Amino acid sequence: AELGKDSRRKVSTHRVDVGEPTQIREFARAAIAAHPGLNIVINNAGVALLGGFNEVDQAQMEWLVNINFWGVVHGTRAFLPHLSQQRAAHIVNLSSIFGIIAPPGQTAYCAAKFAVRGFSESLRHELSMANSPVKLSVVHPGGVLTNIVRNSRTGTGITDNARRAESIDRFDAIAKTTPPAAAQRIIAGIEKNQPRILIGNDAKFMDLLQRF
């Protein structure tokens, strides 16, 4: 909306459930019609779930994976045909530091974010082998100061209300990167065509650590 105040830019907004393929396809058609020169797609939707494997039920895990993983797949599939017709284009898929390491208490989130990483890295190779004009980057943010933890759902097996507050406090203590700084890092990564974009010193450290 702020960008729309600049008359040189055309901005359109759309409300979409990324877990619904039909909605994503309709969104892609509308976005391409409004912006025929569209050549960058960023799959960024994500949710969080508080609780270990035995504390979340199957429906909650499927809800998270449907958004965090399948939303990325649906968005990529919907826009890829159009992007492939451009002279140059880029897909950016958001994974996480938890797509690099897998701490306890994050089974659903890690499963989805590791899946995003694997999907993105494999597709990047496929696009390269096909000499496609579409490049692809996968982003691994560390602690970025957003509301994802505050807006998270709580596992059905958790009865201690204090755990949610503790989780928010821990996240706020380690989330040092601001959203604008994260956005600038992603833009720089696109410009350099980086396969893996790491955001924050914590992500860089964990990326290095998991190699040993």
Q: Which residues are covered by each model-predicted region?
A:
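A glycine-rich helix->loop->beta "capping" turn
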Residues: 6-10, 30-43, 49
